[in-house]
Amino acid sequence: MNEKIQRINFGKIREGLSLPNLIEHQTKSYADFLQLSVAPQERKAEGLHGVFLEVFPIESYDGKVKLEYVNYEIGESKFSPIDCLRDGKTYAAPLYVTFRLKDEEGVKEEKVYMGELPMMTPQGSFIINGAERVIVNQLHRSPGICFESSFHSNGKTLYSFRIIPDRGSWLEVAFDTNDLLYVYLDRRKKRRKFLITTLLRALAAALSGPSSPLGSGGDEEIIRLFYTVEELNLSEGIDEDKVATKVLVSEVKDPHNPDVVLARAYEPVTRSVVRQLLDVGIQSISVVDVQYDDTLIKCLKKDPTKDPVEALKEIYRRLRPGDPPTESNAKLLLKRLLLDPKRYDLGRVGRYKLNQKLNIQVDPDIRILTWEDLVAATRYLIKLRKGEGITDDIDHLGSRRVRTVGELVANQCRMGLARTERLVKERMTLFDVNTEGMTPQKLINPKALSATIRDFFARSQLSQLMDQINPLSELTHKRRLSALGPGGLSRERAGFEVRDVHPSHYGRICPIETPEGPNIGLIATMASYSRFNDYGILETPYRKVLNGKVTNEIVYFTADQEENYVIAMANTAVSEDGTILDQRVAVRFRREFMEVEREKVEYMDVSPKQIVSVAAGLIPFLEHDDANRALMGSNMQRQAVPLIQPEAPIVGTGIEERVARDIQAVIVSEVDGTVSSVTGKEIIVTPTGSPVEQKKKKSKQGSEREGIVYKLNKFMRSNAGTCINQKPIVKKGQVVKKGDVLADGPSTQNGELALGRNLLVAFMPWNGYNFEDAIIVSERVVKEDLFTSIYIDEFEIVARDTKLGPEEITRDIPNVGDEALKNLGPDGIIRVGAEVKPGDILVGKITPKSETELAPEERLLRAIFGEKAADVKDSSLRVPSGTYGIVMDVRVSSGTARVRKEKINASEAKQKIKEIEERYDQKEEELREELTQALSNILLNEKIPLDVVNVETGEIIIPANRKITKVLLRKMAQAYDKIEIDPSPIRSKIFEIIGNFEAKFEQLRNDRELELDQIESGEDTEPGIIKQVKVFIANKRKLSVGDKMAGRHGNKGVVSKIVPVEDMPYLPDGTPVDIVLNPLGVPSRMNVGQVLETHLGIAAKKLGFNVATPVFDGVKEEKIREFLVKAGMDEDGKSILYDGRTGEMFNQRVVVGMIYMMKLNHMVADKIHARAVGPYSLVTQQPLGGKAQYGGQRFGEMEVWAMEAYGAAYILQELLTVKSDDVQGRTRIYESIVKGENYLETTTPESFNVLIKELQGLCLEVNIGQRSDVIGLSVKPTTPKALSGGEAA
């Protein structure tokens, strides 16, 4: 038994919260989308249920027929996740939806199959066509409102706001240089803009009703929304200074003569105006004060429209220039753009953001734009222009949110159902004349929905093949946040600001882990403790602080909420009872760092590692590494290949075990119990106190398989080609507790993540072999397989039915000798266990050649021998170059089309069916024996006063009052589902036992049917496919020169030399070092963490313990010195070293210690390549490039210059002609080499001919001539007619 690794944790900070489940955000999101655990009638209007409620009911155009949605249910998946991975299937379950059709005839309810819905595995991934995929969470601009400012070329600041819906047109309102407010819909600039007052008037028409405060949409109603209207009494006299900023609300007419306008609307109140009004007897007027702002007054003056209908037409004219505007058309357009919930939806988040930002109380269920939103937003914009309030930072996490798996799939379902809706309406119209035969099944075509979902999972930018190199890469992929994808940013458009680290990322997005290259900053990773709230906004936890004392209350804050509080760091000194010790504390407040008195602290970080991601949290002494190197370190841990002998790090950070558990790389016991059986393929744990365990104590009878069975994954191929293999770490009879690790997986040791090995390192130069980050490795590391990994390559071949006849997988291949066929079986498929090299045949296949006119003798042969004499070519599957290994598995699947036609396939199918039947008959017999044993415990040698009757045959199995024997009990077990006994106490006991076994019998029957279905359905191969063969080749790769290695601190390098153990530098006690690194790799890179790790590693190794040094709370330097002295070393960690070759001592003492190194997925075996004979490009006739194409090396322009500099004319001629694209020259030099001559004759290179053709395409006539050994070239303009010899017009 392997003991659990015990680590001494040097973290001084008491964490207020343990790490959450690291993949829960994926599983919870999809569970919320499906709501499987909720009864159909109790489901919330969200996820899949919400999408159906949005689209349905669907009414016919005439309103006579209505199709309503009732509920949905999801069936059981046909195959288990493991079967889907093995057989290349999709892990999905059938979706059944109940619809109700209401027409003139009545109501019809029917359950309709809507296709297969991919199901999430417990690990948070999907299996699509046999490959594990992850749906990456998308970080996008949050729906809601955003206030911005920009600078005009005249130096003026122009303010604007943008209302972004979840679905629908964007609405932007912006100031222009004349302080007028213009509206832009869908970012349409230039002529398609209109004034804000025009939109408000139009909304008055669209929202006409008693509750609308816009009333009739007149000027006065609009003014009252933004200004306080005062009544000015003129008879009391006026103070000119007080009324200087007041203007009239509406025009004033002469009461005696209404045609005379005494004062116009918005005219300033002056002494002359007042006198004029008093003269006609007007005592008071309505005015507004425009001292604060006159924007709306200016807009009303400029507005060409005066009533709502005019406003509607004006908007229509702007958005649909050229179309004649009518009131109904204009109203319909505005409703479609902003007021139709099916076309315009702010979403839950958008409504929440609008209410929060504008401080309004609109009902959360109203998700269209309201007059209240527009008025409040315009008021806020006017305040901004006056210097009140602040603009929004679009890079702040408060302005961004996450679309989770559930939401992304729901959006696809919405698109699919929108297509279904159109089809349903069309079909309703077709049935219009006669609704008699109309049913929901006939109206609905499920293909629209299933095709959309399938397309999303297979092709979407956010559905990615899972990064499966090791468990950490898998976990990080599931915790990734992408700003790319549909509705997101594009690489080319994204500037520096959106990629940069932002203060609001603290505790939510890791500031370290992001890819290097074009995606830097666009793809981020969730921080360790972060989670999404119900609105998809990232939150991070804090501990509440009351009067300078830290409580255990945990509160989650979004980036917006956090800015209102004073928050202390996690490393603030705290006493045992939670009291903050320092009088003044370093805190964060409104994105700034400052010091305050401890009483002012309101919250505190829960852990120092809450700001970094899981991968960065695995780097010990992260606080001593430069950020760039930490980024490389966290990225390279994800590239570490699983080793065949993994070893957990001596110096860890304490979260290694959580990573292995949460990603389910290790198998964990679900119960307290005893290990009853251990094999390489499964572990069985019998729960403590279970009836089986008690029975075993009483007697030695009973099945060994009783208990919980844990199946182990054995030598499975990951997406990256690495090996997934689980091995037991418990023994039979061992007592385990719930949560104990039963089996290790890839890159784990005793339940902890183990990506590499601990090696004895020396930081010193060694004969120049570790120049420029190169790494010197001891031969011991290679011999003992410390860095050996297993790779599994998959090769596939398909035999199809072609026009010329069927392809055939066979051993009978033309023109192939016996030597090449020695490892093939009689069916033409390589045997498992065969050792293969490049060029070997894996699967023999022949394909019919195109038919040609046959000679009489061939026709005779064809007539005598049938199809076999037909002309066929060899199209066998061969091992590609660079691949060596052993065939570990072969999988063959046959198509249905030919099972009936080909005798061999039919007999194979029969044989398989027979085997399945026999296997399940045996299992059923074993289960009946168990039932007999269970019945024996209460009935053997007993008598019961009632008859036990077989209700099907009427036979009395056990007569009343007869002594019950084992034979009778077996008879009873045979007919367990057909027996009947009159009511009595013994009856309930018997039926209780039978009831326990019924589910097991049912499961067996289902499994049997499933396997038989698979045989009969031809294993679901595509149409036209006769046979499909997959061959898996395992390849054991040792560490070799050219392989890339790295530590956890971004200290990467390539193995430059593998040195014999006796030549390696050694310690005074004779121990040779394992690896030599260049000390110059440390100072300029500023990743001192590797040196501290080296010192602490050797001390811990000598003192016999493992270390956990959490990030930002690690071991202090003094403590490391103390350990080094305790371990009998110098406190500076340096040792005397001797040269292995000479035995002499090196001049300087050297840093020697234990460092954790990983082998990365960049191996020389994958990269090394040389071309001998290979394919050429069709156009240029030059060799192709790249290893995949078996290409050559490009001899480019600069290389030509180098040759010219040396005057190597003949080598250059050879390179640019016969070795490249001189087609005739290639043939001739081949002939001369075969003949043993050394003669080079060149002709015109093909690329020159291509150039001439291109010039001719530009109507330039090119002529090549030769005069007295000088080749001349003339280029002159011409016409298409001349070039084509008169063919072209």
UniProtKB/Swiss-Prot annotation:
Per its record, the protein catalyses: RNA(n) + a ribonucleoside 5'-triphosphate = RNA(n+1) + diphosphate
EC number(s) on file: 2.7.7.6
Q: Which cysteines are joined by disulfide bonds?
A: none
Print the keywords alphabetically: DNA-directed RNA polymerase, Nucleotidyltransferase, Transcription, Transferase
This protein's record includes keyword Transferase: yes
Query: A single Gene Ontology molecular function, please?
Result: DNA binding
Its Gene Ontology biological processes?
DNA-templated transcription
KW Magnesium (keyword) present: no
Subunit structure as annotated in this protein's UniProt entry: The RNAP catalytic core consists of 2 alpha, 1 beta, 1 beta' and 1 omega subunit. When a sigma factor is associated with the core the holoenzyme is formed, which can initiate transcription.
Q: What does this protein do?
A: DNA-dependent RNA polymerase catalyzes the transcription of DNA into RNA using the four ribonucleoside triphosphates as substrates.
Q: Write down the NCBIfam families for this protein, in alphabetical order.
A: PRK00405.1, rpoB
Q: Which family does this protein fall into?
A: Belongs to the RNA polymerase beta chain family.
UniProt protein name: DNA-directed RNA polymerase subunit beta
Q: Which organism is it from?
A: Methylacidiphilum infernorum (isolate V4) (Methylokorus infernorum (strain V4))
User: What gene codes for this chain?
Assistant: rpoB
